[in-house]
């Protein structure tokens, strides 16, 4: 049975992402994991960080790869398939590499359930749009939006992976102490890992040039931007010798 594109769920999902991002800005609070776990109410169950990250990121990978598997196989298929492969690559890393290497604190079960629901919904939205709704001209591969967007995606993913590596090296296995991250973009901002992922999804939005992708990029900017802001405050309060010239998210600006 051939699946056709229905714009209503695509627009509804995109509007939901944009609304969630706006609510994050209005509430002005960070998500309660990692450095901000102390804000979680007592009695809330926790999951080991590695298990939580693996299970919550897995749906986006499974959904995107599952939809790709049903498409005709070729080295360079329709642009939508190639773009969905980039989306899948991000979640492959998050699911099978990042989750196994992370040394983070236990993850609140409530936040885990929310993150899992988000990954299911967003994975379905992005994959459904790119496979069944997206229409690109034959010359899209040479369009500046595609080429620059893919460049930003790869650049952002590289920054994110390198920054995560830097953070892991600050802590020996079993340690729960915090140290000042240095090197790379941490020279300029406290949330280098967040900045990398924001750049990544802005690049994805440019390359896809779609409402769902821009909605996802907006949500990412709001969510990770808020995390970066509170991470910066955390470092300033904890370390008296924290670099005063370092910003929260955007070098020299914010």
From Swiss-Prot:
Keywords of the record: Differentiation, Endoplasmic reticulum, Lipid metabolism, Membrane, Microsome, NADP, Oxidoreductase, Sexual differentiation, Transmembrane, Transmembrane helix
InterPro entries reported in the protein's UniProt record: 3-oxo-5-alpha-steroid_4-DH (IPR016636), 3-oxo-5_a-steroid_4-DH_C (IPR001104), SRD5A/TECR (IPR039357)
GO molecular function: 3-oxo-5-alpha-steroid 4-dehydrogenase (NADP+) activity; 3-oxo-5-alpha-steroid 4-dehydrogenase activity; amide binding; testosterone dehydrogenase [NAD(P)+] activity
Domain of life: Eukaryota
Transmembrane segments: 8-28, 72-92, 146-166, 206-226
Reactions accelerated catalytically: a 3-oxo-5alpha-steroid + NADP(+) = a 3-oxo-Delta(4)-steroid + NADPH + H(+); 17beta-hydroxy-5alpha-androstan-3-one + NADP(+) = testosterone + NADPH + H(+); 5alpha-pregnane-3,20-dione + NADP(+) = progesterone + NADPH + H(+)
Function: Converts testosterone (T) into 5-alpha-dihydrotestosterone (DHT) and progesterone or corticosterone into their corresponding 5-alpha-3-oxosteroids. It plays a central role in sexual differentiation and androgen physiology.
Family, per entry: Belongs to the steroid 5-alpha reductase family.
Name recorded for this polypeptide: 3-oxo-5-alpha-steroid 4-dehydrogenase 2
Organism the protein comes from: Rattus norvegicus (Rat)
Lineage: Eukaryota, Metazoa, Chordata, Craniata, Vertebrata
